[in-house]
Amino acid sequence: MEVVLVSVWGFMDVYKLHPKFDLILDRFDTIQKEFKDNLEHIQFGHWYDDFAHSKSGGIYNPVAAPLYGELDQEQEQLSMIEQFGKDFYEKDGLRTHKNVNWVPTLTKTLQDIGITRRASIARMKPKAKIPLHRDGDPNPPDGILLRGIIGLDVPVEEGKKCYIMVRDRPKKTWHTRDIKNKSICLFQPNAIHSVINQINGWRYVVLFDTVVWFENYPEVVKSCRTTGVWANLD
């Protein structure tokens, strides 16, 4: 399994954050089957605060299906709460959407791994592109927010692929990673990035947020202070 963290200051091993991440691979067949079997029941909404993700021709497209998020991170979940307020409830200390009932193995696996800040399922149209942008999610004062993409149901088509490009600011280069079934890419969402789907089919991924806490990774703090890019200035 290829596991990559792309950020403005370099790479990081995802297993340092979530050592049990291989549970996704161990349970992937069940996770994918549950998703495919229940796709018609899953509710998708939009991130109306992110035009690059959600807007096309002046019309918002349903692109994200919320699963859960931490109770004290309401601002990050606000657009989904406003759309699906009645469908959220509290479970195990998390703000949970009824979508989790259709993907129980995925939900349990993410939480077994220790991913609690936010999780959702995102879809992308055939032959579509999310243009270069940066997400507006703020970093916590004592850490750095990271976003993960797990390939959940990505069609296979010869000569075509779905991929993400993330800018490496210090090197003035781009990191490119394919998005395919079982692939995992973890990056800093307020780094400039773009997603391209060349495939003639809908692409579905799991999106999740997690945090590198400075107290646990002092080398990250040292690197950020040395490079001066921790504040994501461009």
Q: Where are each of the predicted segments found?
A:
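Catalytic core of non-heme Fe(II) oxygenases with the double-stranded beta-helix
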Residues: 99-185
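Catalytic core of Fe(II)/2-oxoglutarate
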Residues: 162-234
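Non-heme Fe(II)/2-oxoglutarate
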Residues: 2-112
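Intrinsically disordered, low-complexity peptide-like regions
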Residues: 11, 59, 131-133, 207
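Hydrophobic transmembrane signal anchors and adjacent membrane-proximal interface regions, especially
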Residues: 3-10, 14-19, 23-26, 44, ...
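Short loop/turn segments at secondary-structure transitions that flank enzyme active sites
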Residues: 37, 127, 154-156, 193, ...
